[in-house]
């Protein structure tokens, strides 16, 4: 993924007929894959409380999701995805208010920054792409990921990647159109896999995030992060 792209996404709860519906809409199955994601944070969840999500995907590398523009409300989230390790390290140091660590590898700064593993799970994914009827051929395709985690939670995600904030409203309109075509209720929200993992296996951490969420002006973005979190 190109550095600095803005990810606009909406999560939903898929049903048994979701893949068939995607085919009816002209969607193409790109691949099926299984992977392990491991998430890192401080014991106090300082990153998550700041709406930052650090993940290492097995055989893929590091990614840090940072919040997008303020004031975008609705059953969706908007994040900037950082994948270049020096950029990730610089942002981590900024959020955690740490100086003097340079811009090296992410793994090298985990200890100095007090970051530790907080969640790790395996996901089975089917990845789809499609273009809505009437869309400009030069517009990026919409992506739909259907995930099932190894702890039994299934979630879908409609995603568009854009380069500038000015492109976000158009991306949102396309995401909402496709969601409607898939039968997703207009205001349905679905938590990210990581949030459900914390709720089930680290309830105290989950409660801590809920308390932070309740004090925010934009609660939706913490309630449905992640993919955060993919």
From Swiss-Prot:
Alphabetical keyword list: Acetylation, Cytoplasm, Hydrolase, Magnesium, Metal-binding
Keyword Magnesium applies: yes
PROSITE patterns in the cross-refs: CYTH
Effect of residue 39 to A: Strongly decreases affinity for thiamine triphosphate and enzyme activity
Cofactor: Mg(2+)
SMART domains linked to this entry: CYTH
Effect of residue 79 to A: Decreases enzyme activity
Main subcellular localisation: cytoplasm
Modified residues (N-acetylalanine): 2
Subcellular location: Cytoplasm
Amino acids binding Mg(2+): 7, 9, 145, 157, 159
InterPro entries tied to this protein: CYTH-like_dom_sf, CYTH_domain, THTPA, ThTPase_euk
Tissue specificity statement from the Swiss-Prot or TrEMBL entry: Widely expressed but at a low level.
Molecular function in Gene Ontology: hydrolase activity; magnesium ion binding; thiamine triphosphate phosphatase activity
GO biological process: dephosphorylation; generation of precursor metabolites and energy; thiamine diphosphate biosynthetic process; thiamine diphosphate metabolic process; thiamine metabolic process
Cofactor binding note: Binds 1 Mg(2+) ion per subunit.
Outcome after substituting residue 11 to A: Mildly decreases enzyme activity
SUPFAM superfamilies on file: CYTH-like phosphatases
Domain of life: Eukaryota
Catalytic activity entry: thiamine triphosphate + H2O = thiamine diphosphate + phosphate + H(+)
Binding of substrate, residues: 11, 55, 57, 65, 125, 157, 193
Oligomer and partners: Monomer.
Family: Belongs to the ThTPase family.
Protein name: Thiamine-triphosphatase
Species of the source: Homo sapiens
